């Protein structure tokens, strides 16, 4: 490819504080192992007036997952080496148990354990300890799809990997990372700090320019799924290590970034802690990271030997910034979608009975819709009277049915329009035997509220909103991890006499949790 258009790239970077508003951040572009651009702005701590620099360490959150998998490959070998240990770990399982490779590729079908902490009564700013993580993960008995058939993001996959690695090697993951990854890659200040409450070198902020920016409180202990703290310079060193070892047939990043498939042979979007994407016909590998108050993203284009890194100490869209930086570096112009006028027949709520997942659509203006299906809203471009798509989802409408496809997830669902009013007779206590947790629903002044209770405590009351007959939505926008589960979908079941017998509770991260009415 021709040389990078540095003025265009620099103009984009210098506009980041205006376009991604927040306390501070740091970004870099690396090409052919050399630094093209390295920039920090703003403050690491607003109250202390401590400036952000390329040496400032920040939590890289889920970007840590690739490093956990790197330790697995480097110290132990192929994932199958730990399959018997995983069988012992998930010894309560009733369904087909996933393999360790399924964990590495987010194809396990296990429900995300941070989402499950909500159902077990955790407070968003509560303390979450290592023994509580194992308590939750080892009680699991089922998956929300057959392992190897679909993709679903699951932090617990990598928490389990960390436990298995430490058990197999007899060493801490922190020591293994320092010796086998950080030292060879010259990541001089990178460190695993599992307790988020202990990190105080930089402050992460919740909020925005409307509500203001407030220091985020995090008191969770995570391992394997996240936990590494690193500076921009550390992350640059990782990209340079990737470039130095690119010709090594057994090079660590070549192994991490190798293509993966689903059980049916379809290409998978994820492997060994890395997300696979494409832009302008070029394959990208990388990962994002999020915790309350923090966002980061890295992308690597092996074909052109280009990497982009974005680190924010606020909840801005680091993924968007990193991809736009990559496109600028590659000389890819912004896409210009063709949009059609929205047909009102799109708008409303749609249910897939098999998964209990609900799709909500509303007009976003300009030939676009706001869709709520996963952990956060998606903006869909309407390309025809009965077709719409985003970067993740394609919708095709046929009367009162929408065919939803998420190619990367190997997921195809028939969504049925919800029509009619919801009955108000859902108050009561419900029990999940698998989680040993309760859902309490109450009616106050004609409004329905719900709370979760389990081994992690008793949650606040959350309002419920009707989506259709026997289908309700319970939004949870703050939880121990980020992003939060979003909307929990509650689908109620009745017997022949019309009495409620139970409810299926789920979200994209954790589907199909069955509760019986007590």
UniProtKB/Swiss-Prot annotation:
Biological process (GO) annotations held by this record are: proteolysis
Q: How is its activity regulated?
A: Inhibited by beta-lactam compounds such as 6-aminopenicillic acid, 7-aminocephalosporanic acid, benzylpenicillin and ampicillin. Inhibited by p-chloromercuribenzoate.
> Which positions are catalytic residues?
62 (nucleophile), 65 (proton donor/acceptor)
Q: Which segments carry the region annotation Important for specificity?
A: 477-487
Could you tell me which SUPFAM superfamilies the record lists for this protein?
beta-lactamase/transpeptidase-like, D-aminopeptidase, middle and C-terminal domains
Pfam families attached here?
Beta-lactamase, DAP_B
Task: State where substrate binds.
Answer: 481
Q: Which UniProt keywords apply?
A: Aminopeptidase, Hydrolase, Protease
Which EC number applies? 3.4.11.19
Gene3D superfamilies attached to this UniProt entry? 2.40.128.50, DD-peptidase/beta-lactamase superfamily
Coiled coil region boundaries: none
Q: Which family does it belong to?
A: Belongs to the peptidase S12 family.
Tell me the subunit arrangement.
Homodimer.
The name of this protein is D-aminopeptidase
User: What organism is this sequence from?
Assistant: Brucella canis (strain ATCC 23365 / NCTC 10854 / RM-666)
Its organism's taxonomic lineage begins at: Bacteria, Pseudomonadati, Pseudomonadota, Alphaproteobacteria, Hyphomicrobiales
């Amino acid at each position: 490819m021709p040389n990078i258009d540095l003025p265009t790239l620099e103009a984009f970077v210098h506009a980041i504080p205006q376009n991604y508003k927040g306390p501070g951040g740091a970004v870099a572009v690396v090409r052919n192992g050399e630094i093209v651009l390295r920039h920090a702005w703003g403050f690491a701590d607003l109250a202390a007036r401590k400036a952000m620099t390329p040496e400032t360490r920040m939590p890289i959150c889920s970007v840590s997952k690739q490093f956990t998998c790197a330790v697995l490959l480097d110290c132990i070998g192929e994932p199958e080496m730990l399959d018997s240990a995983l069988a012992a770990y998930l010894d309560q399982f009733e369904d087909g148990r996933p393999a360790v490779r399924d964990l590495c590729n987010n194809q396990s079908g296990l429900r995300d354990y941070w989402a499950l902490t909500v159902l077990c009564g955790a407070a968003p700013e509560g303390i979450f300890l290592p023994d509580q993580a194992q308590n939750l993960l080892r009680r699991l008995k089922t998956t929300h799809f057959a392992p190897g058939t679909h993709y679903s993001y699951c932090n617990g996959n990598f928490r389990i990997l960390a436990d298995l690695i430490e058990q197999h090697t007899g060493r801490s993951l922190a020591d293994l990372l320092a010796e086998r990854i950080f030292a060879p890659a010259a990541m001089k200040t990178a460190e695993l700090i599992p307790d988020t409450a202990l990190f105080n070198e930089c402050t992460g902020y919740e909020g925005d320019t409307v509500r203001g920016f407030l220091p985020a409180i995090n008191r969770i202990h995570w391992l394997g799924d996240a936990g590494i703290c690193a500076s921009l310079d550390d992350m640059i060193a990782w990209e340079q290590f990737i470039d130095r070892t690119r010709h090594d047939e057994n090079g660590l990043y070549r192994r991490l970034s190798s293509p993966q498939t689903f059980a049916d042979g379809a290409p998978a979007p994820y492997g060994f802690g890395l997300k696979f994407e494409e832009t302008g016909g070029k394959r990208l590998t990388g990962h994002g990271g999020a915790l309350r108050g923090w966002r980061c993203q890295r992308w690597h284009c092996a074909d052109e030997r280009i990497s982009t890194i974005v680190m924010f100490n606020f909840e801005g869209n680091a993924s968007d910034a990193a991809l736009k930086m990559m496109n600028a570096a590659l000389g890819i112009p912004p896409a210009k979608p063709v949009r059609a006028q929205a047909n009102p027949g799109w708008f409303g709520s749609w249910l897939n009975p098999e998964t209990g997942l609900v799709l909500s659509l509303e007009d976003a203006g300009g030939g676009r819709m706001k869709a709520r299906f996963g952990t956060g809203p998606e903006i869909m471009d309407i390309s025809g009277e009965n077709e719409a798509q985003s970067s993740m989802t394609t919708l095709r409408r046929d009367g009162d049915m929408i065919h939803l496809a998420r190619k990367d997830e190997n997921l195809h669902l028939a969504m049925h329009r919800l029509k009619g009013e919801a009955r108000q007779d859902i108050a009561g206590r419900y029990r999940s035997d698998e989680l040993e947790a309760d859902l309490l629903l109450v009616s106050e002044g004609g409004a329905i509220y719900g709370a979760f209770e389990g081994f992690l405590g008793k949650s606040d009351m959350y309002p419920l909103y009707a989506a259709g007959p026997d289908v309700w939505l319970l939004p949870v926008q703050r939880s121990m991890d980020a992003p939060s589960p979003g909307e929990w979908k509650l689908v109620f079941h009745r017997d022949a006499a019309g009495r409620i017998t139970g409810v299926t509770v789920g979200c994209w991260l954790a589907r199909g949790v069955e509760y019986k009415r007590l």
